[in-house]
Amino acid sequence: MTKKLHIKTWGCQMNEYDSSKMADLLDATHGYQLTDVAEEADVLLLNTCSIREKAQEKVFHQLGRWKLLKEKNPDLIIGVGGCVASQEGEHIRQRAHYVDIIFGPQTLHRLPEMINSVRGDRSPVVDISFPEIEKFDRLPEPRAEGPTAFVSIMEGCNKYCTYCVVPYTRGEEVSRPSDDILFEIAQLAAQGVREVNLLGQNVNAWRGENYDGTTGSFADLLRLVAAIDGIDRIRFTTSHPIEFTDDIIEVYRDTPELVSFLHLPVQSGSDRILNLMGRTHTALEYKAIIRKLRAARPDIQISSDFIVGFPGETTEDFEKTMKLIADVNFDMSYSFIFSARPGTPAADMVDDVPEEEKKQRLYILQERINQQAMAWSRRMLGTTQRILVEGTSRKSIMELSGRTENNRVVNFEGTPDMIGKFVDVEITDVYPNSLRGKVVRTEDEMGLRMAETPESVIARTRKENDLGVGYYQP
């Protein structure tokens, strides 16, 4: 009988990527097939996030539901991974003794051995260590699911912003070697992937080893990825202003595969609050980056993260944030009310902004961003946008749907053979959450740039011969 695996994922795109790798790994080693129904599963995995408020209680609430399933099926294996597991592993074991496996973001590759151990002697396993980049060496080959894919290029963060748990839960920055990244992307391209989103907690801090032992920059990596035939669109997230160097901006000037959209978190427009946050940059330095970017790529649109109600934030500080939002003209944002994360320096600060004031500031900020986003959408009316067709529209099975470079969903009439390809669409209608258009050009008429085939990249970067024997590539 087929063994089944259920994974519940909370949090960032890195967690989504990790969960997909867990599924691929346990399919390869144990034959587990994914199911959306927890009651059907032989193994339940919870991939957690500790960024938001009450993250721990959310975990225990979910585990309480799964405990009932285990009471009915004692052979059921329950595992908790992700950032809450990394931060609170022993506490989870003490409070939820029925949990069999606790693993961190850097030890998910050891899940097969952990499951075997639990199956063997029923002893619980806790492994929340930080074995650097080892996990990527033990994951199965990537499997494409549609024309877009996420690829993790680094882990961790060295910035230690005062509100953030990432350095404590995912460790400090560790970069994957460039050949490993290119090999994975080339494999995805060979399976029909057209757009890759490079992931990292501080993605533009990537400094990976090249085949000759030298260290490559993030700008170098972007150009190498863009050279792979079939990869015609590149995104990356999440970046940090302090690492946004001029060589990255030059890639925007000369590499059309890099989209005209950037998510660059700023958090606040007040230098005083930025200093309390440990951000190590000013609002003016942030605006200077945007100015250079728009000189290199005039049509680029910017999104950001904001925290409102940080300890000590005054009305004047908030007004400076609103001024920054207007000056940059952000297209969208992920914005949240400050909530202290245990173990961070900000948790020891006096949270002196009233809750109602925080909510009011968040409402004002989000309303302004929404207005700016709609204005950006209206400017697209009558323009021709290049769309990567992802599949049928959720609005109508008779229509197709895809995304623009600036991440707008566009619905339009088309044929099934367009799925997985690019089309140029004239925007005819603008709605709050989507656009509508009509196809004016198909991919065959575009003459997309070709540089190096995926097969060539695979042959150049693979670490073993046809017999599976590893070899040294000078």
From Swiss-Prot:
Major enzyme class: transferase
The keyword Ribonucleoprotein is annotated on this UniProt entry: no
Binding locations of [4Fe-4S] cluster 1: C12, C49, C83
Cofactor note: Binds 2 [4Fe-4S] clusters. One cluster is coordinated with 3 cysteines and an exchangeable S-adenosyl-L-methionine.
Coiled coil: none
UniProt-listed InterPro entries: Elp3/MiaA/NifB-like_rSAM, Methylthiotransferase, Methylthiotransferase_CS, Methylthiotransferase_N, Methylthiotransferase_N_sf, MiaB_methiolase, rSAM, rSAM_horseshoe
Domain MTTase N-terminal: 3-120
Positions bound to [4Fe-4S] cluster 2: C157, C161, C164
Gene3D superfamilies: Methylthiotransferase, N-terminal domain (3.40.50.12160), tm_1862 like domain (3.80.30.20)
Keywords: 4Fe-4S, Cytoplasm, Iron, Iron-sulfur, Metal-binding, S-adenosyl-L-methionine, Transferase, tRNA processing
GO molecular function, one term: N6-isopentenyladenosine methylthiotransferase activity
Cellular component terms (Gene Ontology): cytosol
Cofactor: [4Fe-4S] cluster
Coarse class of the protein's main subcellular location: cytoplasm
Domain of life per record: Bacteria
PROSITE patterns: MTTASE_N, MTTASE_RADICAL, RADICAL_SAM, TRAM
EC id: 2.8.4.3
Pfam family, one: TRAM
Catalytic reaction annotation: N(6)-dimethylallyladenosine(37) in tRNA + (sulfur carrier)-SH + AH2 + 2 S-adenosyl-L-methionine = 2-methylsulfanyl-N(6)-dimethylallyladenosine(37) in tRNA + (sulfur carrier)-H + 5'-deoxyadenosine + L-methionine + A + S-adenosyl-L-homocysteine + 2 H(+)
Localization terms from the record: Cytoplasm
Radical SAM core domain segment(s): 143-375
Stored NCBIfam families: miaB-methiolase, MiaB/RimO family radical SAM methylthiotransferase
Family note: Belongs to the methylthiotransferase family. MiaB subfamily.
Role summary: Catalyzes the methylthiolation of N6-(dimethylallyl)adenosine (i(6)A), leading to the formation of 2-methylthio-N6-(dimethylallyl)adenosine (ms(2)i(6)A) at position 37 in tRNAs that read codons beginning with uridine.
Protein name per Swiss-Prot or TrEMBL: tRNA-2-methylthio-N(6)-dimethylallyladenosine synthase
Lineage of the species this protein comes from: Bacteria, Pseudomonadati, Pseudomonadota, Gammaproteobacteria, Enterobacterales
